[in-house]
Amino acid sequence: MKMTAIAKASLALGILATGTITSLHQTVNASEHKAKYENVTKDIFDLRDYYSGASKELKNVTGYRYSKGGKHYLIFDKNRKFTRVQIFGKDIERFKARKNPGLDIFVVKEAENRNGTVFSYGGVTKKNQDAYYDYINAPRFQIKRDEGDGIATYGRVHYIYKEEISLKELDFKLRQYLIQNFDLYKKFPKDSKIKVIMKDGGYYTFELNKKLQTNRMSDVIDGRNIEKIEANIR
């Protein structure tokens, strides 16, 4: 009888211990799932807020170069309103002079100090060398969207007004259009991408599940040589 009682007690303790462990394991999994969900949700909100936000363009302005702490900047003064743009890659060599006139800037505000100076990344191009009365290129823009029961395809054109255009400007304007017209960031975009295809067969890709990398915001391409643009929303 004693052995039976001991066995029963051991079994009960084992069930209780196992139950506690299982419950704890489930709680940990639930917490991890919640944290992951909250992070994904925050990522979507951050992307949607950024690409739904305001942008501005400064035309035919002069950028004054300075460097500090290994970083390189151009300062623009437009009617006593200052914009500081951090530059990367080839722009560091392109704009080595202290004074760089004849520039167009695509600005998205990353921050602003107490004096009203706006901080931005890249988006610097040289102004058009020829005169144009309208757009200079109108590549086909094809949008494919997963709509549950299949893939729907839509088409339009995307007008280009610059001989030089930054990846920053292309990325921002294309995503903003998709947000406004195709519910981009209504859910997490997973493997969604935009592909800008050039006439020579080269291409540039924007991954829609993250913000364009800051160093790529300085990259510039010839707007006249864009063949077509494709977006896949999944």
Curated annotation (Swiss-Prot):
Family matches, as PROSITE patterns: STAPH_STREP_TOXIN_2
InterPro entries noted in UniProt: Enterotoxin, SSL_OB, Staph/Strept_toxin_CS, Staph_exotoxin, SuperAg_toxin_C, Superantigen_bac, Toxin_b-grasp_Staph/Strep
GO CC list: extracellular region
Keyword Transmembrane in record: no
Matching Gene3D superfamilies: 2.40.50.110, 3.10.20.120
Factors inducing expression: Induced by Sae and repressed by Agr.
Entry keyword Signal: yes
UniProt keyword annotations, A-Z: Signal
Record's signal peptide: 1-30
Pfam families on file: SSL_OB (PF09199), Stap_Strp_tox_C (PF02876)
Family according to the record: Belongs to the staphylococcal/streptococcal toxin family.
Subunit structure: Interacts with host SELPLG; this interaction prevents SELPLG-mediated neutrophil rolling. Interacts with host MMP9 (via sialic acid-containing O-glycans); this interaction inhibits MMP9 activity. Interacts with host GP1BA and GP6; these interactions play an important role in platelet binding and activation.
Function per UniProt: Secreted protein that plays a role in the inhibition of host innate immune system. Modulates the interaction between host SELPLG and P-selectin thereby preventing initial rolling of neutrophils toward the site of infection. Interferes with leukocyte trafficking by inhibiting host metalloproteinase-9/MMP9 activity. Also associates with two different platelet surface receptors GP1A and GP6 leading to platelet activation and aggregation.
Name under which the protein is recorded: Staphylococcal superantigen-like 5
Gene assigned in the entry: ssl5
